[in-house]
Amino acid sequence: EGLNLLNPSFTEQFLGTADAKRYQLSFAPLDDTAVTAELLQSDGSWKALAEGTDFSVDRTAGALTFVTPPGESPLDGQDNLKITAARTVEGYADRVGRCRVGILYGVGGASDRIFLSGNPDYRNRDWYSGYNDPTYWEDSAYSVLGRGDSAIMGYSILAGRLATHKD
């Protein structure tokens, strides 16, 4: 999953090896927020590991180095290391937060996503939320509709399809 426009936290999972101590996250630099790591146990539960005790964080590089390698997964083929960190991107929340128009819409008449537009800084762009999740707005979940000098003014549903109205 991509970064959430509304929340800087993200979680990545890894399939550990017997000797790997350093794990590179997809995003950097990281915020000063505490980084958490969890290690999969043989019973399927997750054991919390502590920053500063079990691992160190290079926030500039977006990498963790473990004192002891997390090792191989106790469950064949299943990721055994879960890391949660945060990376704030200035202006991300405003991309949807400054929108002025929206509608519920989904395929086949389901109302399972929110579509938003009307942000004066992104006049011809519309964003859509995660499936049945109005709290998740992936940073790449948007469409650019037509020319930038023609703003999206609203939405309607016509014959089961989402229509976008521009000025």
What residue ranges belong to the model's regions?
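Extended beta-strand solenoid/passenger and fiber regions
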Residues: 1-70, 86-102
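Surface-exposed, short loops/turns at beta-strand junctions within beta-sandwich domains
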Residues: 70-77
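Short, well-structured beta-strand segments within conserved domains
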Residues: 78-85
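Beta-propeller and closely related beta-pinwheel folds
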Residues: 92-167
